[in-house]
Regions:
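N-terminal secretory signal peptides and thylakoid transit peptides that target proteins
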Residues: 1-14
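N-terminal Rossmann-like dinucleotide-binding module
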Residues: 13-95
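Hydrophobic residues in well-ordered beta-strands that form the structural core
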Residues: 53, 120, 143, 149, ...
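Alpha-helical structural signal in soluble globular domains
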Residues: 66, 70, 93, 133, ...
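Short, well-ordered coil/turn segments that N-cap beta-strands
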Residues: 74, 116, 139, 166-167, ...
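Short, Asp-centered acidic motifs that coordinate Mg2+ and/or phosphate
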Residues: 78, 117, 197
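Beta-loop-alpha module in the N-terminal Rossmann-like domain of NAD(P)-dependent dehydrogenases
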Residues: 99-156, 160
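Predominantly a Rossmann-like dinucleotide-binding segment in NAD(P)-dependent oxidoreductases
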Residues: 167, 174-210
Length: 210
């Protein structure tokens, strides 16, 4: 399996989690875990995909955990994070050399391409510019939702990804969570009859991501 196929299926192995009150204190250690069923499409790689993480906060740590737990599939080789303790923590976890530690995402792209992919887990308003720059340099991208703040920016990303023949995999990870897999299965089987209306909300408490 090559790196493109991994990026296409990577989100099957990743998931966000609803954090209960008794786990909130452990967020900094990122000790909670969300397990999804093994993806049958995931095949062994010839070598691990190398990636640079932009943003080493909560979501950057989640993808970092995947790399730590699946070293044959993903290796983190660089990080951009402006908060010093997060930068140092992430670098130490993944044994990132000093030359590949950056304070800003802009600094990453001052270097020639030195990894297969970029993981963009920056704040929502900082998705568009790093994504466009990464595409220009030939990186494949794992992009946290939302893609970008405006429709036009989303269209710009799509157009450049097609032009450069690069992957932009958007992290709608809950699509593959056991909760939604089971819901789809029950509806498809007709277990609750014919579905004529759906009201959906995210079942999280008020402290979620506060």
């Amino acid at each position: 399996m090559n790196r493109r196929n991994l990026l296409k299926t990577l989100t099957l192995s990743l998931g966000a989690t609803v954090i209960s009150s008794d786990l909130l204190a452990k967020v900094d250690e990122n000790t909670y875990s969300f397990k999804t069923p093994q993806n049958p499409l995931l095949k062994p790689l010839d070598k691990a995909v190398t990636a640079i993480t932009l943003g080493a906060g909560n979501r950057g740590m989640v993808y970092g955990d995947f790399a730590k737990n699946s070293p044959k599939e993903l290796k983190i080789v660089g990080v951009a994070e402006p908060i010093p303790f997060r930068n140092e923590r992430y670098s130490n976890i993944h044994s990132i050399p000093k030359k590949n530690r950056f304070d800003t995402w802009e600094d990453v792209f001052k270097r020639p391409k030195f990894a297969d992919a970029i993981i963009i887990s920056t704040p929502d308003y900082l998705h568009y510019e790093p994504c466009m720059k990464a595409l220009e340099l030939g990186y494949d991208i794992l992009l946290e939702k939302p893609i970008a703040p405006t429709e036009q920016e989303c269209r710009d990303i799509l157009a450049l990804a097609k032009k450069k023949n690069r992957i932009v995999a958007v992290c709608h990870v809950l699509r593959y969570a056991p909760y939604f897999i089971k819901m789809k299965e029950l509806i498809a089987k007709g277990a609750i009859g014919e579905v004529v209306s759906v009201q959906h909300f995210e079942p999280v408490e008020h402290t979620h991501m506060a």
